[in-house]
Regions:
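Karyopherin-beta/Importin-beta family HEAT-repeat alpha-solenoid scaffold
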Residues: 1-943
Length: 943
C-alpha cells in the first residue's frame, strides 16, 4: 500500500502510468486472497488511506472504529474523480483476481464469505452514493463503473456456485436501468449503450440476479414507447437491444408462452415479431433474425414439452385450451413466414459475397426451426410451403412471370423447397400423414422438375437446382407409397440426367439416387432395366467421379439384393461383375505400358473398380436375419441351394477380380486402398448366416491371406491381413479345424519373426496382437494346441508391455484378459492355461513386466495395465500376491540402484489390491499407487 501511495505522488506515473498502478492493485488483490482472514477489507483501507492522505493497512485490527457510515461520504466529497475512479478500478481488479484464483477447498468457502460480507458491501455503498449523488451523470465515472460491475457479476456467480453466499444485485441493477431510461433519445453519450452491453453480459452470466421487479422494469422499457423510439431513432444498437430482449425473456419462457392467448400481451408478441423481421439481409445487414432463431426454438420447446402446465394454467377449460392452441399456431405461422422470406437467396448473389458460410448456417438453423415448428402447426405449414411452389410453377407454366422477375420467383420456389426438405427428413412411410403424401404427389406431378432441368441447361441457378435434387431425396419415404411408386421412374430419370449431363450436380445426384435406392430397394425391382445403360456408362467411362461410380453401383446392387428370385438376382450380378472383370482386366494389362501422365488417372479408376466390388458386397448384405427376409422356409431353402451351387460362377468372378488386383499387378498389389477394399469384400460375407454371393469358405479366405503374405514386397498392408484373419476366426471358428488354423498361425508367426518384417512397427504389432486377441476370445484352443508357438506368443506379448503406443497397449489388454479369463475355452483349454501359470514362470514374468511398465507409462494408459492386473488377481488370487510382492521388491531394488525414486508403500498396495479380488475398486488403488510412485498429485480429487 505504501508503494502504491508513492506512485500516486509521482506525477509521471499518475499521468501516464495506469498500467503500473493496475499491476500494483493486482498484487494487493492477490495478497488479500492469501491473507483474507487477517486483512479483511482492503477497499476500506484504500478509502481511509485517501481520507488521511497516507497509506493505511489495518492488518488484524479491522474493528477499530476508524471506518464508519460517514467515511464513504467524506471520501467522495474530498477525492478527485480520478481517485474515485481508481477505487472502482481496484474493486474491479479485486473481483477479477478472485474469480481467477484457485484456492484450496477448505479456504474457498471462508474466502467467499469474507468477500460477500466485506468487499461487496463496500463496493455497493460507494457505487450507490456516486450514482445517486453529484457524479451520477459523469460519463467517465460510468465508463469505469460498468466494467467493475460486470467483474462483480462474474465473481458473484462463481461464488454462489462454490459457497452458500447469495448476492443481491438489485440496487446496482436498478441504478443502471434508471440511468439508461432517463437518457434522452437520441443519446448524446455512449453510457446507455454500454449499460445495455453490461445488462446483456449480466443476463448471460447469471439471470437469477434479475429479480421480478427488475425484469418488469426492463420489460416496461423494452415493450413500451422507449423501446420503439430507440429502435426507430438509433437502429445501430438494434443487435444488442435484441440480445437484451431475448435473454430477458428466456429467463421465463414458460411464463411468456402462457401469455400467448392473453389479449393484453398481444403487443408484446407483435413487438417480438417486428424485431425478428428486422429490415435487412440476414447475417450481412442484420443479425437479429439469426439471434431470434434460438429464442423461437425455446418457445417451441416450451409449447411442446410443458402442455400439462398450460392446461393447469388454463384450468383445464377446453375452450381456453383451444384458443391457446389456435393462437400458438398463428404466432408460429407468422414466425415461419418471416423466416421463409429471410432465407431467400438474394437475386443478386453478390449481396452475400464473403458471408456465404454464415448465410448457409443461418438457413440451416432456420430449417431446424421449421422442423421444430411442424409438430405444433402440423400440415398447414407443409401445405403452405408446397402451395408456394405449385403457385410459382403454375405462373411459369402459363407465362405469367414478368420479364426480369424469373430469378426472384425461382428463389421463392427454392426457399419453399429448402424448408420442405427440413420438415420431410423426419417422415417415414409409416408416419407420414396422408395430406402430406398428397402434397408431395402434387409437387412431383407439377412441372417443377422440368423447370429445374430447363434452368440447369442455362448453366446458372445452382441453389435452386441443388435444393430441388435434395428435395426428391428428402421424400424417399414417399416412393414406398402407392402414389409414390408411380413417380419413381420419372424421379430416377431426372436424377440420372442431372448426374450424367452436368458435372456440377454429379455428386449430389448420385447421393440422392443412393438414398432412394437404399430406402426403396423392394419398390425398385421393375426399374432395374433402367439402370443398365447408366451402370455400363459408370464402369466404362474412366472420367466419371469415383464416388459417383461407387454410389451408383452400390445403389444398383442394393436393388438387386431385393430381388426374390435367386436366379434373376444371379443373372443381374453376373452381368455386373462380368463388366467389372472385363474392364479391370483390360486396364490392369495396359497399366505398365501407360505414359506417366495417364498412369495416375488409370490407377484411380482401377481403385474405384475394386471399390465398386466392395460396394456390391455391402449392397448385397441381407438387411435382416435370413428368416425375417425369407419368411417362407421353402424360399429360404431355395435361395441357400442356389448360392451353394452358384451355377453362374459368381464366386469365381469375385475371386478372379481379387486375384488380379492382389497378385496380378506390380503397381497395385501392395496398394493400401486396394488392400482395404479387398478386406471389405471378404468381410461383407463374414457376418451372413446363409450362403450368398459374397459368402466364401473360411479356408479359402485363409489361403488367400497366407498366399498374399508370401508375395508381399512391402508390409504396409500386413496389418489388414492380420485383421482379416482375426475376423475370419471370430466369425467362423466353429466351422474351422483347429489343425488348419494352427498351421496358418504358425505360417503367420514365422513370417512375422523373419527379418523381412519390421517387428518394431507399431501398426504391425498392434494388428498381430489384435488377431491373437480375437483367437483367444473366440476359440482359444486354436492358439493353445501348439505349445511351442504359444510359448513364443506369450513371451512376445509380455515384452510388448513396455510399448509406448496406446493402441498396442489396448490390444495387449484384450489379449491378456481374454487369455486369463478364457470365457470361450473348454475344460482342456482351462487346464492348459492354468498349468502355464502354475508350473512355469509365466505368472511372475507377466507380473514383473506389467508392474514395471505400469510405473513408467503415461497416466492415460494406466487403465490398460489395471485391467490385466485385475484379471490375474481375480483368476489366480493365491499366486498373484506372491508374484506382486516379488516383482515390486525387484523393481524397487532396481530403481534405487539406478538412482530413481523408491516405490513407496508397495506392501500396503499389494494388500489393498488383493482385497479387491479383481473388482473395479482396484482402479483407484492402481491410479493412486502410480501417482504416489511418480511424485504426482491427483488435483481432481483435491478439488
Amino acid at each position: 500500500m505504501e508503494r502504491l501511495w508513492e506512485l500516486f505522488q509521482d506525477e509521471s506515473v499518475a499521468n501516464h502510468g495506469a498500467f503500473v498502478i493496475k499491476k500494483m492493485l493486482s498484487n494487493l488483490a492477490l495478497i488479500f486472497a492469501v491473507c483474507f482472514r487477517e486483512w479483511t477489507n482492503p477497499l476500506e483501507d484504500f478509502i481511509l488511506s485517501a481520507k488521511t492522505a497516507h497509506p493505511l493497512v489495518r492488518f488484524g485490527r479491522q474493528n477499530d472504529g476508524a471506518f464508519n457510515e460517514g467515511t464513504i461520504a467524506q471520501f467522495l466529497e474530498s477525492s478527485s474523480p480520478v481517485f474515485i475512479g481508481t477505487f472502482l478500478t481496484f474493486s474491479q481488479i479485486m473481483a477479477e483476481e478472485l474469480t481467477k484464483k484457485d484456492v484450496s477447498h477448505t479456504d474457498k468457502s471462508d474466502l467467499h464469505t469474507a468477500v460477500h460480507e466485506k468487499l461487496f458491501p463496500t463496493t455497493e455503498s460507494v457505487a450507490t452514493k456516486i450514482f445517486t449523488g453529484t457524479n451520477g451523470a459523469n460519463t467517465e465515472m460510468w465508463n469505469i463503473w460498468l466494467p467493475c460491475f460486470n467483474s462483480w457479476v462474474s465473481y458473484a456467480s462463481k461464488a454462489e456456485f462454490d459457497s452458500t453466499a447469495r448476492y443481491n444485485m438489485t440496487p446496482l441493477l436498478r441504478i443502471a436501468v434508471q440511468r439508461m431510461a432517463n437518457e434522452p433519445i437520441p443519446w448524446k453519450t455512449d453510457v446507455p449503450e454500454r449499460i445495455i452491453d453490461s445488462l446483456v453480459e449480466s443476463l448471460d452470466i447469471n439471470s437469477t440476479f434479475f429479480v421480478a421487479d427488475t425484469k418488469n422494469d426492463l420489460k416496461a422499457l423494452i415493450f413500451g414507447p422507449w423501446g420503439r423510439q430507440l429502435l426507430s431513432v438509433t437502429p445501430e444498437v438494434s443487435d444488442q437491444f435484441a440480445r437484451l430482449t431475448i435473454l430477458l425473456l428466456e429467463c421465463d419462457m414458460v411464463q411468456l408462452a402462457m401469455q400467448i392467448a392473453n389479449e393484453e400481451s398481444s403487443d408484446v408478441f407483435e413487438f417480438l415479431l417486428r424485431l425478428t423481421d428486422f429490415p435487412g439481409m440476414p447475417v450481412v445487414e442484420e443479425t437479429i433474425s439469426s439471434d431470434f432463431i434460438e429464442f423461437w426454438m425455446q418457445m417451441v420447446d416450451s409449447l411442446t414439452e410443458d402442455t400439462e402446465r398450460f392446461k393447469a394454467y388454463l384450468d383445464g377449460d377446453e375452450a381456453k385450451i383451444s384458443l391457446f392452441n389456435k393462437k400458438s399456431r398463428a404466432l408460429l405461422n407468422n414466425v415461419a413466414h418471416i423466416y421463409w422470406r429471410k432465407i431467400h437467396i438474394p437475386v443478386d448473389e453478390d449481396a452475400i459475397k464473403g458471408y456465404e458460410e454464415e448465410f448457409r448456417v443461418f438457413r440451416r438453423d432456420a430449417g431446424d426451426l421449421f422442423e421444430a415448428i411442424y409438430p405444433i402447426v402440423r400440415n398447414e405449414l407443409y401445405h403452405s410451403l408446397s402451395g408456394n411452389v405449385l403457385y410459382a410453377v403454375e405462373q411459369f407454366k402459363n407465362s405469367k412471370v414478368p420479364q426480369g422477375e424469373e430469378r426472384a420467383v425461382l428463389n421463392d420456389i427454392e426457399a419453399s423447397m429448402y424448408l420442405i426438405n427440413a420438415i420431410s427428413e423426419d417422415f417415414s412411410e409409416e408416419n407420414a400423414p396422408q395430406e402430406i403424401v398428397e402434397d408431395v404427389y402434387r409437387l412431383l406431378n407439377s412441372e417443377v422438375l422440368q423447370l429445374v432441368t430447363g434452368y440447369r441447361v442455362q448453366g446458372s441457378f445452382q441453389h435452386f437446382i441443388y435444393t430441388a435434387i435434395r428435395f426428391v431425396a428428402s421424400v424417399s419415404w414417399f416412393y414406398g407409397t402407392e402414389q409414390g411408386l408411380t413417380c419413381l421412374p420419372v424421379i430416377l430419370n431426372f436424377l440420372f440426367d442431372n448426374m450424367m449431363d452436368s458435372p456440377t450436380y454429379e455428386l449430389i445426384s448420385s447421393r440422392a439416387i443412393a438414398e432412394i435406392c437404399d430406402n426403396c430397394r423392394l419398390s425398385l425391382q421393375e426399374t432395374l432395366p433402367n439402370f443398365k445403360n447408366i451402370v455400363t456408362e459408370m464402369i466404362e467411362n474412366v472420367s466419371v467421379d469415383s464416388i459417383t461410380r461407387e454410389r451408383i453401383i452400390n445403389s444398383y446392387s442394393s436393388i438387386i439384393q431385393g430381388v426374390r428370385d435367386p436366379q434373376v438376382q444371379g443373372e443381374y450380378l453376373h452381368r455386373l461383375l462380368e463388366l467389372l472383370l472385363k474392364h479391370s482386366t483390360e486396364m490392369l494389362n495396359r497399366l505398365d505400358g501407360l505414359p506417366k501422365e495417364q498412369l495416375d488417372q488409370v490407377k484411380e479408376y482401377l481403385i474405384s473398380i475394386i471399390s465398386c466390388v466392395s460396394a456390391i458386397g455391402r449392397g448385397m448384405q441381407l438387411p435382416d436375419a435370413p428368416e425375417d427376409v425369407y419368411t417362407d422356409p421353402k424360399e429360404l431353402q431355395l435361395v441357400s441351394k442356389y448360392w451353394t451351387e452358384d451355377p453362374l460362377g459368381i464366386h469365381a468372378q469375385i475371386l478372379q477380380i481379387v486375384q488380379n488386383f492382389a497378385m496380378g499387378s506390380e503397381q497395385l498389389s501392395d496398394n493400401l486402398k486396394v488392400a482395404e477394399e479387398i478386406e471389405a469384400i471378404f468381410k461383407s460375407g463374414l457376418t451372413e448366416s446363409m450362403p450368398g454371393p459374397f459368402v466364401f469358405p473360411p479356408e479359402l479366405i485363409t489361403q488367400f491371406i497366407t498366399a498374399k503374405i508370401a508375395t508381399l514386397k512391402t508390409f504396409n498392408t500386413l496389418p489388414l491381413l492380420y485383421d482379416l484373419f482375426g475376423k475370419v476366426i471370430r466369425a467362423n471358428h466353429r466351422d474351422m479345424s483347429a489343425e488348419s488354423v494352427s498351421r496358418t498361425l504358425e505360417q503367420i508367426w514365422t513370417g512375422f519373426q523373419s527379418q523381412k518384417v519390421d517387428s518394431s512397427d507399431p501398426d504391425i504389432v498392434q494388428a498381430l496382437i489384435g488377431m491373437l486377441a480375437a483367437i483367444a476370445g473366440s476359440s482359444p484352443g486354436m492358439l493353445l494346441r501348439d505349445s511351442r508357438l504359444l510359448q513364443a506368443v506369450v513371451v512376445f506379448c509380455i515384452e510388448q508391455l513396455g510399448s509406448k503406443e496406446r493402441f498396442v497397449l489396448q490390444s495387449l489388454e484384450q489379449f491378456w484378459t481374454k487369455l486369463i479369463h478364457l470365457r470361450r475355452g473348454n475344460r482342456q483349454d482351462t487346464i492348459t492355461v492354468r498349468r502355464l501359470f502354475d508350473e512355469t514362470d509365466l505368472g511372475h514374468m507377466l507380473m514383473y513386466n506389467l508392474l514395471k511398465s505400469l510405473l513408467v507409462t503415461q497416466r492415460s494408459n494406466i487403465s490398460y495395465f489395471t485391467e490385466i492386473l485385475k484379471a490375474v488377481v481375480a483368476k489366480y488370487p493365491m499366486l498373484a500376491k506372491q508374484w506382486m510382492m516379488q516383482s515390486l521388491e525387484k523393481i524397487n531394488r532396481e530403481r534405487l540402484e539406478s538412482g530413481q525414486k523408491a516405490v513407496s508403500e508397495y506392501e500396503l498396495f499389494v494388500k489393498r489390491v488383493m482385497l479387491t479380488r479383481g473388482t473395479r475398486t482396484a482402479n483407484g488403488l492402481v491410479k493412486d499407487f502410480w501417482l504416489k510412485t511418480n511424485g504426482l498429485v491427483d488435483y481432481d480429487r483435491r478439488l
